[in-house]
Regions:
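General beta-strand structural signal in soluble alpha/beta enzymes
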Residues: 105, 131-134, 155-158, 189, ...
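Solvent-exposed alpha-helices and their adjacent loops that cap or buttress functional pockets
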Residues: 55-60, 96-97, 122-124, 148-149, ...
Length: 390
């Protein structure tokens, strides 16, 4: 099926995928006066007395802004904010369909980090949460950090943390299959951009002890010249021994390969050099770092990709709707490390022991158990971490 042509037709016919629906029927003078003037003055005054009343008298508690500057749209590159609109509309559809969250696309005509931070800060009083989307690395790290520091609502860059959470969920179940402990395995993360960086830190937070990072120039090591600051930080944290080499060197004896890089980078010889029952998440799109059947023929036990036409799809829609659902319900001020880990464990837990096998380590996006499990886990973790307004 030609999804490109089908999608063009859909978008042309609908002229957009979202709309605003009124929750109030205004059919007479009384209902008009209640929903708008003069009645609306009463909740307005209550909010002016206490800003927290915005969660009582408005829809703010269920609203998320999906913000993008279009600098890293899917695998298409820097096409600008206007071109990002179909993607952001689609993201809003997923928020509603999979999480019951009302979301609005905010596509920006600037790629200046200071301007983006200021715009989002000034818009934030209208929303209960901010989802950053398709903002290029390493700018995305600074933008998210500054917004998290300066706002008291959740700020979540899905390209980073959504992917990291699903990878952790998949890895939890994959390690069960191969009967290995995350504290003991050697993990290679290839492609330390937005997703790869977040994956690495989350795996470390979950207990991983041995992580090697590599990019197109080879293994990251502290004394390497001309590295972006976030790569230097990763190298100094995870490669204190200053180990050097290429991807082939990195994967020798590894138990887990996580690719968020480019297609066809992982060869059969590399897979054969890994430990027995290797786990491979080859998430480059549209062409994975290695195709699942090729990886398995070379000895891999569990293989996941970013594609829906292969088993074990690493799909962010398993995470972000339920995460925001739980965070909004808890009136959380932040999305913490523990909330992310709780979400990953909840996603992994949807797959029962009876269902778990090498081709079924992650639930499907349409599994209704996912939203319930993730939102509850995130809600409970937010309360435990003390980041709620409740």
């Amino acid at each position: 099926m030609d999804y490109n042509q089908k999608s063009l037709k859909l978008h042309e016919e609908l002229k957009g995928k979202i709309e605003v629906i009124s929750r109030v029927k205004v059919g007479d003078a009384e209902s008009l006066a209640t929903a708008y003037t003069p009645g609306v003055a009463a909740p307005t005054l209550e909010i002016s007395k206490n800003p927290e009343n915005s969660y009582v008298y408005t829809r703010r508690g269920n609203l998320v802004a999906v913000v993008s500057d279009g600098s890293a749209i899917l695998g298409l590159g820097n096409l600008g904010g206007l071109s990002a609109m179909p993607v952001m509309e689609g993201k809003c559809v997923l928020f509603k369909e999979f999480g019951g969250v009302d979301a609005f696309p905010i596509c920006l005509d600037t790629q200046n980090s200071d301007e983006i931070v200021n715009i989002v800060k000034n818009l934030s009083i209208s929303f209960g949460g901010i989802n950053l989307e398709d903002i290029s690395s390493p700018r995305c790290f600074e933008i998210e950090r500054r917004l998290n520091d300066e706002l008291d609502i959740p700020v979540f860059h899905d390209d980073q943390h959504g992917t990291a959470i699903i990878v952790l969920a998949g890895l939890i179940n994959a390690l069960k299959i191969v009967k290995k402990d995350i504290k003991d395995v050697k993990i290679v993360v290839n492609g330390p951009g937005a997703a790869g960086t977040a994956i690495t830190w989350l795996l470390r937070d979950f207990g991983a002890k041995n992580i090697t990072l590599s990019d197109e120039y080879g293994i990251l090591y502290p004394s390497r010249d001309n590295m972006e600051w976030h790569k230097k930080e990763l190298a100094e944290t995870f490669n204190k021994e200053d180990v050097r080499g290429n991807l082939s060197d990195a994967v020798k004896g590894a138990d887990v390969f996580i690719g968020v890089s480019k297609g066809n980078l992982l060869t059969t010889d590399m897979v054969k050099s890994m430990n027995k029952d290797a786990i491979i998440f080859a998430m480059a799109n549209p062409t994975p770092e290695i195709l699942p059947d090729v990886a398995k023929q070379a000895g891999a036990k569990v293989v996941g990709t970013g594609r829906s036409d292969f088993p074990n799809q690493v799909n962010n829609v398993l995470a972000f709707p339920g995460i925001f659902r739980g965070a909004l319900d808890a009136k959380a001020r932040k999305i913490t490390k523990n909330m992310k880990i709780a979400a990953a464990k909840a996603i992994a837990g949807v797959i029962s022991d009876d269902e778990l096998n090498a081709d079924n380590i992650l639930p499907k996006p349409f599994d209704k158990r996912v939203k319930v499990a993730v939102s509850k886990a995130v809600f409970d973790a937010a309360i435990a971490d003390g980041v709620c307004r409740m």
